[in-house]
């Protein structure tokens, strides 16, 4: 499933791994430094935390400037198996439904990739998502 996740370009927006900056790194224009407990830590959020137009087509306009009104922030997928509703509006109740609603930049490729998988490969991908 994890290999399919990468092959389907899901990992472009749902970035698997980040490493935090080193301890004592100055952040927020010098207002803070990163404490030792948070420096150089590897996390697996499965998100780039950026805004993307995934073409949800629901007409929900997000707050913000004109350039981002139809964009939503990539949600972290860690713990996604515990969420009863998926996507930005909570209208998807299964992984398959959520994948089918991806469109726009990159989302169409991922959706089409999923649609062309065998039933067994779809099950493998969904099992991987359920493991996060």
Give the ranges of each region predicted by the language model.
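Periplasmic c-type cytochrome electron-transfer domains
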Residues: 2-132
